[in-house]
Amino acid sequence: MSNRTGLVTSADTQREVEQLLYHQAEVLDERRWEDWLDLFTEDGIYWMPASPDQQSGEGQPNIFYEDHYLMDMRIRRVEHPYAHSQAAGHRTSHVVSNVMIKSENQASHELVVTSRFHMVEYRLDDLRHFGGKYTHTLIKSDDAYKIKLQRVDLTNVEGPFDFVMQVWL
């Protein structure tokens, strides 16, 4: 299968990548944090830049820039019985689309994939919408892809947020 970038990938690879991204959305919506964390490599990074033109997360202000250890720490905090900010009523729904494989390095089994997302969050009797672009760097490991880097570019990143994001988009 050839896309507009001229990259030739198999339909099986495209489907496998799509299924990974759809699965990620599902486990986030179901608040299955451990399953979500398992989608990342041990050195995986979740990054949400504070600016759309940001080239690096290191040494820059970010909304999120978390390695495996920090993601695990956030899970422990969110799941803690005294985490009142995460009380019942917090729900999300993710939609992922326009999944495109942008590059493939067959020697390192690494893919760069972009997609679009829309996430609706219901929390504190309020409905919030987030949308934007995901860029995933995926590594094939044990016959399955894992996330080495997930970059989340919010469409409205410069806009005001009425309360702090507690969980990942």
Where do the PLM segments sit?
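Conserved aromatic-histidine-acidic binding/catalytic patches
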Residues: 9-12, 59, 126
